[in-house]
Amino acid sequence: MTQDILHRYLFDNADVRGELVQLQNSYQQVIGSHAYPPVLQTLLGELLAATSLLTATLKFSGDISVQLQGNGPVSLAVINGNNLQQLRGIARWDGELADDASLADLFGQGYMVITLTPDEGERYQGVVALDKPTLAACVEDYFNQSEQLPTALWLFADGKQAAGMFLQILPSQEDHNADFEHLCQLTATIKAEELFTLEAQEVLHRLYHQEEVRLFDPIEVSFKCTCSRERSAAAIKTIDQAEVEAILAEDGNVEMGCEYCNAKYLFDAIDIASIYANGTASNTQQ
């Protein structure tokens, strides 16, 4: 299977668009820096695939965030990305999590926030409750509320690989529900193992061999963290200088860590003085 690729496709005889994403390296980079319980590894894989599929529907340059929050043992799971399919993510949890825990078990009274931030234009935010049995169903609910277009998703993850498929009726073609339902029935026969092991062309042939499918050029998906020494310096400047200097006196340096990729940035006394004087550290060493 080609790793970390998203495919978009259309049906020549139906007003429906589709997407298929297969992830491995980017998924491993999201979960590899943290000791996530198996159920959280699976959830983050599904969330990563869902965010990639959502990102492919964007019609602008900018950022996307898909965030799950609640009052259960998992307080946060989030994937952030952009229109270039560059993604990163984290989760926060407390205590033991059962391998078969449901969304309700993990998040309690939870909700999903999808935030779209164009480089130009106004930010959009949609919120839906995590009151469906699966993450895929919750994302479908978001589309039903925000775009009011019939949409279906299938999400899979096993701690090693993640994958997903997406179908949606094209805008202004909502009366073609019969075609959409037929294609959903075909797509629902997909198995995780097929998405994890087969090339996209073979998957589409197995599902839609009686349909005329037009497959577009593949899009690479990657893990990309946006942390930097400069951003860490800017964060330090928001802290009271006396507090930072107390840490410096005790430890000899100030360490800033990234939650997403676990990168560490060290700042010594000269750096700290430069940050509060000029807003930037005096050197560029990590």
Curated annotation (Swiss-Prot):
A GO molecular-function annotation: unfolded protein binding
Keyword Thylakoid (UniProt): no
Protein localization: Cytoplasm
Alphabetical UniProt keywords: Chaperone, Cytoplasm, Disulfide bond, Redox-active center, Zinc
Keyword Manganese: no
Family statement: Belongs to the HSP33 family.
Protein name: 33 kDa chaperonin
